[in-house]
Amino acid sequence: MCNSSSEGKEWTKNYVYKYLRNVPNPKFLDIGTGQGTYFRMLNSGYPNAHWTGVEAYKPYIEKYRLMEQYHTMHNADATELYGKNINVSQLHYDVVFCGDVLEHMTKEKAVALVEKLTSCCGILIISIPIIKWPQHDDTNPFQIHVKDDWSHEEVLDSFHGVIDHSKGDSVGVYIVAGDRYIPKD
């Protein structure tokens, strides 16, 4: 969602700083950039980072000046990341953010996307509503919550490789180990 909940953001920031403490030039993939929340939250701590953004709703790219923030910006649906025009599996990212994205697709598509994303990253960070959270938007079709009833337990059961999490009142943040995960002390 464009106006992302602040719940779990500080925990996420601290987790990323700890995970990347010895990585001088990290690579980030931010799926569903919205306003660029994760970029704004972390960019000052990683001046040499490379940021790739993916945003399905083109007006957000213009409105929030995302082309000026991200080194690489794709106007694409998250489910199109493995097509002929964009294939993120051929790239490596230290951290992939999937914030407020998975509730906008069916459970089956969400599980498939997470499985694909873990093949190209160290960690995948999922931020998702864990209460019934219907959402409709007359101007942005990508804002509709297709699966609006995720629970904490269902997230843990559905996405394999969760190594840590922060459960809030309405939003959960889940760290999923990717194929390139390097355990930290």
Located regions from the model:
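Class I (Rossmann-like) S-adenosyl-L-methionine-dependent methyltransferase catalytic domain
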Residues: 1-88, 105-112, 116-119, 123-185
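A conserved beta-strand element that flanks and buttresses the S-adenosyl-L-methionine
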Residues: 97
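Histidine-centered divalent metal-coordination motifs
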Residues: 100, 104
